[in-house]
């Protein structure tokens, strides 16, 4: 072969590769353009939704031959990820089906596959949106009404399953009910008797289901002025109202009505038989909730009316607003802008709807979806974007919450405190405090003065003491926090009579001269174990006076800031560990922190958090200290429960971390063994990558990890047993004493305490659930007072 010929061949090869790359690039550009067109269809533009759809159908129809799979994937993704545009995309699919029946069938198959996969993978929202999309395709003459009703009936069959959690049955009923607003009218016109039969089956189920969980999830214990309805009961009432109105709703846009003459000529597809996957123990279903209500039409000024609590429009509006928050919560400015750009804002009092939905998220039980500060920051952005109206609505909401606070759930009380203090800090702490003057005459444990006091404590964390003092009217003097300074007893006037004063002064000099931990130990060694303690807690197993002198002196020297305190603790970590060998000694350390910093709640919180991180004190010691007699006067203060919850969370995170590490190690071991076995069987022509020793944990390592996890589980169980046992003891004692004295046990103290018990159950429900049978056997037995036992039974019912 000549050189010339070889050269030509090389050029041809190069041109071929270049043309192939160009085709790939061009295809990618077309795919990107198609995706952009599909994603943006129906959004604000100079032309109507209908003309947008017509233009897009023409484009997609031309590209179906080449980009069929891509178009199928994009449309099915939009159905799940953009439920607010459901009817736009169903109309698009309907028009494509009218032009290309085969593509319509392929899309239905694709959506069915998405729906089944979502159910199998426990992606419950995705499954619900897929079902809604399939249902709306009935309106577009893509799917037959008969086959949809068969699917809905199959889903309602789950409500008759035995030995499965009620939350599973509830979800399938909820999924069907929440789909009916889209397709109810069409089913009513075409298959009225079948629809009525379906509704009757739902009603039978709803009438017999247990609602033991209801009270645990309420924001308020009182139903005045707005009932706190369980979510399925509320939706069922809304669906019944919709049925009374002949399934005519006024909220859902239905662009397919314009194309009815085209769509009604299209051939329909039948859904295949879809059987919901059976229940497995590892399936987690959405927990029940209570529908939050703050406003009704009387709260809103002149303008559009707020839809009634049982109108389906209220459900649809709230669901849409919740979805906006879910989509944009990572970026507060975008979230606020999207909420205020709600497409139907001229038909409703939008500011009231938004504020109600944001507080519904914040007060959601057992825990909010996102951090408290997420909702606070969104509300701030809303006030900035809509300064003429939204601050007034928010002030009105705050007043409503404050006036109803005496029946508010304890967890929601905490969140209200956190939100309001944060909000004030962003608006120069401006509030009409004079309007709340009259509530200062109430007992200090009453929720209203308690709320004001806790808000001021939180404001102190976000500002400084002098600012808080200056901003408050003089009538609030008794609620203003104490000046946050350490109370170092070895520098007080009475210090000369205290047994540890001399050593404390020596220690001050030594630490200021940058002594070593060993030198501190040397100074402390001469302190006698006299059994001295501020609470006589020493039984001789530890030297309480030595702990007293060391802890108070060191932390007083580090009192300038959190950083100074942390540095001091870290430097003398070994001394702390040596002194804190027993749980009693650890409680003594906590006692001294409280004695030194009783006027600075935040300092106590961060110091105890630091001691837990450094493993100087155990979680069980903190729990025991919180319930000790010394802390009786602090028992209803919010910071103490902040400490308990951070303690429990620390233990929970430790257990979760060990569990994750063990699972990962077991997976690696199993894969290594499997790979080794496959390599032996594999033919020599295909050599597999060898598993290195570093990749494969030994069985001994896995066994040690199992032992560590078992020990952590034991400690976690012990922590919960301590907490719940102490709650039972103090509540039982209160109830017995009230009965003996003939007094009403339902005091403010009792409501705070029973609320805190409920809070522990709900805030840590995932971890507590593991030990529910143990708790039932050892603590929450049938002979326990019904008031206490009911809290436990409500908790168990959440996932029953």
From Swiss-Prot:
An example molecular function term from Gene Ontology annotations: mRNA binding
Major localization listed first in the record, in broad terms: nucleus
Entry keywords, A to Z: mRNA capping, mRNA processing, mRNA splicing, Nucleus, Phosphoprotein, RNA-mediated gene silencing
UniProt cross-references to InterPro entries, sorted A to Z: ARM-type_fold, CBP80, MIF4G-like_typ-1, MIF4G-like_typ-2, MIF4G-like_typ-3
S-S bridge residues: none
SMART domains: MIF4G
SUPFAM superfamilies: ARM repeat (SSF48371)
GO CC annotations, alphabetized: nuclear cap binding complex; nucleus; postsynaptic cytosol; presynaptic cytosol
Phosphothreonine: residues carrying this PTM: 9
GO biological process: 7-methylguanosine mRNA capping; mRNA export from nucleus; negative regulation of viral genome replication; nuclear-transcribed mRNA catabolic process, nonsense-mediated decay; primary miRNA processing; regulatory ncRNA-mediated post-transcriptional gene silencing; RNA splicing; siRNA processing
Subcellular location: Nucleus
MIF4G domain boundaries: 31-243
Protein role: Component of the cap-binding complex (CBC), which binds cotranscriptionally to the 5'-cap of pre-mRNAs and is involved in various processes such as pre-mRNA splicing and RNA-mediated gene silencing (RNAi). The CBC complex is involved in miRNA-mediated RNA interference via its interaction with Ars2 and is required for primary microRNAs (miRNAs) processing. Also involved in innate immunity via the short interfering RNAs (siRNAs) processing machinery by restricting the viral RNA production.
Listed name of the protein: Nuclear cap-binding protein subunit 1
Source organism of this protein record: Drosophila sechellia
Lineage: Eukaryota, Metazoa, Ecdysozoa, Arthropoda, Hexapoda
